[in-house]
Amino acid sequence: WYSSMFAANIKQEPISHHNHHHHHHHGHHQHQQRHNSNSNASSPHQSPLPNLQLEQYLKQQQQQPLMPPGLPNPMQTIMPANMRPSPTARTTTTTAAAAPTTTAAAIAMQANDKLQALTPPMDVTPPKSPAKTQQSCAEPEKEHDLMSNSSEDMKYMA
């Protein structure tokens, strides 16, 4: 019974880890696509503004279906080929596609913020803590070694 439960835990753990890794990679990839589309649309580089502009633009597109066809191109670059809005179901497809892109970009940006927030302490603390421990451990050892060496040298010298 214990071995079977342990094997089940072993089986379950890599699966969950793989799913988490795949989800994070997908969110990051979506964020890269969104960044490229924003640069094509020549929108500001700050992260909150493109989301708001994209939502406002989609609302405008729903209210005014007679806009030029060149404007939805940045949106089409984000969506897969099967999700591209056809002229008949443009409003429903854009509203359905607006939520996943914004949420995926928000998740990716949150993940990037978490990574950026976590990496500097992780990069800074390991050099500090081993240096502190090495210094605190090495200084008494140095003094002790100097004392023992000097006393031994004195013994051997005498």
UniProtKB/Swiss-Prot annotation:
Q: Where is this region: Disordered?
A: 18-96, 118-158
List all Basic residues biased stretches: 18-34
Q: Where would you find this protein in the cell?
A: Nucleus
Q: Where is the composition biased (Polar residues)?
A: 41-50
Q: Where is the composition biased (Basic and acidic residues)?
A: 139-158
Q: Which UniProt keywords apply?
A: Developmental protein, DNA-binding, Gap protein, Metal-binding, Nucleus, Repeat, Zinc, Zinc-finger
User: Which stretch is the leader sequence?
Assistant: none
Annotated GO biological processes are:
segmentation
Q: What does this protein do?
A: Gap class segmentation protein that controls development of head structures.
* Name of the protein: Protein hunchback
The species is Drosophila mimica
